[in-house]
């Protein structure tokens, strides 16, 4: 039986707040990003009468709280967009007691009353990350919203591109373009216009492709699928299923691992489920392999993060499961994403 009122969904969850000075300023100044984070709260009124009240929200065990009035018609579903205020209390919350600022609560109340009719919380991840200036990302989305949520958390300008928009728009306006997980399968019509993506990279853009399966990416004349990468790149069945498998930096000074965030072993802690899938088994020497890892007792795999210069631009292919880590709020995944979309920028 449905409750009379419901906070059905809070998005994004977890809430990732990018704060480049986390843990630096004892006064808590500059703890919030320049653009305060936004959260969507989906409300459902299951009753046959209207409801007038308010949504209150704040960090656990922190004050003050913020209130927003809501007016729900009978049996109405409504999505409320709220902004986490850039107040002195909120800026200082994480620094004073980090363990008490790692959750954000939302409650539905009658107007003017303090009693919670319903209350829900989402975890908060405070992220120490930087993104290059003037980054503008276009992306072709995969099966979920992990990527757009992560780009929003990083505070970068971004736009989801349909295949038609890839085909007809001026791609040079984007500093980076991401082809999300398995997009060549979920939107196979992109294959026919893939050459335009390669031309974008050749002209100076930064093209990033997330993991795909063998039968979605490897050249296959029978399925009219040409080589999708600018150079030879053949995926295999190899995977790393141990989420704690050790990571080696093969080229520790490479810019992709150092700018604008210097990555380290800590960025690969607290991963969930696995490291990567369908690791490349063969690639052109133009590609540089930056990371190496393996399951216990298995041969090392070097194709988890490949990068190549292409014309005036760059091409990155990564078979690592960043989407799972972004969705789980793993800080290192956000720092790596920030480096990928910043690659080639000053």
Regions found by a protein language model. Give the residues of each.
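Short, solvent-exposed loop/linker segments at the N-terminal edge
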Residues: 26-36
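Asparagine-centered strand-capping/turn motif at beta-strand->loop junctions
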Residues: 43-47
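Short, aromatic- and glycine-rich surface loops/edge beta-strands on solvent-exposed regions
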Residues: 1, 55-57, 90-114
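Intrinsically disordered, low-complexity Pro/Gly/Ser/Thr-rich segments with frequent PxxP/GP/PP motifs
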Residues: 62-90
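Catalytic beta-strand/loop cores that center a nucleophilic Ser/Cys/Thr
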Residues: 237-330, 335, 345
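A glycine-rich, often tryptophan-bearing local segment used as a flexible ligand/cofactor-contacting loop or short
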Residues: 182-269, 318, 338
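Aromatic-Pro/Gly-enriched surface loop or interdomain linker
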Residues: 100-180, 211-218, 232-234, 239, ...
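Short acidic/proline- and small/hydrophobic-mixed sequence motifs that coincide with surface turns
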Residues: 48-53
